[in-house]
Design a protein with these regions (language model features):
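Short catalytic/metal-binding and nucleic-acid-binding patches
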Residues: 1-320
Length: 320
């Protein structure tokens, strides 16, 4: 499929993707070699606890959210990957992700006494949700991931960081992990807060009604997984077995490889096709303006271009 699309292109490949202010995105990033660097239990031999891991993740996330003006809707720290459902209010998603992932990586390396890569080299998978229903499913997907992965029977049992059960507008406080963050740096306050923000979906519902709708969807997902395991005579891993998982080990479950990384999460094929077509047109326009830039001709990159305008001041078009 990728070869066919490459043959259909009339321009050189464009790796850039539009970074649009106000986009609702589900960000997923995996650890290197699928190893359990994000395990809530860390290394018990060094005195690590789930509470310490949750606090480090929460502080790091809250610090980036406040710095880059992101609205966080859901988050879940799994053992070897994590999920963030967010609205990129100001169009700062690349810098936001860099802050989260670089600080998590450095902190985890410091914690475990290692010096190699923490994240997989493929970068994060960022999918845009084009409808209210898809956005709600993103929240439920993140909140219920420990259950759908077969780790715990109920999402509230998960020992890592999770927004499951957080009401919209609820704020929680995290304390600076002084073993990583410099207390003399003014960017690292002793305490920092993180608020779960309601996404701009189902606007006819109040915050409480939308929360109830989300929790009903989460309950449906959890019961479906429990029924599936019961029918297959399988058990969830459980906390005791999770606590024995070594952080340096890798997941043994089956993993699809060499698949195209999705950019749109839509169950409606028409909406998905429309969004993908808009993305193709954007890349074609970007390629044309990139050629103009290389040739020294006047250049105006399409709205949503990020790197060249931010770093080199290349003009960018205004929002349509």
């Amino acid at each position: 499929m990728n070869r066919t699309r490459a043959q259909e292109r009339t321009h050189e490949r464009v790796r850039a993707r539009p970074v649009l202010p106000g986009a609702r995105v589900l960000v997923t990033r995996r650890c290197h070699d699928r190893r359990f660097f994000l395990s809530a239990f860390g290394d018990p031999r060094k005195g690590h606890t789930p509470e310490q891991t949750e606090n480090f993740y929460g502080y790091t996330l809250a610090r980036a959210v406040l710095k880059y003006g992101v609205e966080l809707h859901a988050a879940c720290q799994m053992g070897n990957h994590h999920h963030l459902s967010m609205t990129d209010v100001l169009g700062n998603r690349p810098n936001f992700k860099n802050s989260v992932h670089s600080n998590l990586a450095r902190g985890l390396n410091a914690r475990f006494g290692r010096f190699d890569s923490v994240w997989s080299g493929g970068g994060s998978c960022d999918t845009v949700a084009p409808s209210d229903h898809e956005s709600l499913d993103d929240l439920a997907y993140a909140d219920c991931n420990p259950v759908t992965s077969g780790l715990v029977k109920w999402a509230h049992l998960w020992p890592g960081f999770t927004t499951y059960g957080w009401r919209f507008g609820e704020t929680r406080t995290f304390k600076r992990p002084d073993w990583y963050y410099d207390p003399d740096n003014p960017d690292n306050p002793e305490f920092i807060t993180l608020t779960r923000v309601r996404p701009a979906i189902f606007l006819e519902l109040s915050d409480d009604e939308l929360f109830d709708k989300l929790m009903a969807r989460c309950l449906e997902i959890q019961r479906a997984k429990q029924a599936e395991y019961k029918a297959e005579n399988r058990r969830f891993m459980g906390l005791a077995k999770l606590a024995r998982t070594k952080w340096w080990r890798r997941a043994k479950s089956w993993e699809d490889r060499f698949n195209e990384v999705p950019t749109v999460a839509a169950s409606d094929r028409k909406k998905r096709a429309e969004q993908l077509e808009r993305d193709r047109k954007w890349r074609a326009e970007y390629a044309l303006e990139r050629d103009n830039l290389k040739a020294g001709r006047p250049t105006t990159l399409p709205h949503g271009a990020y790197f060249l305008p931010r770093i080199y001041g290349v003009p960018v078009a205004k929002p349509p």
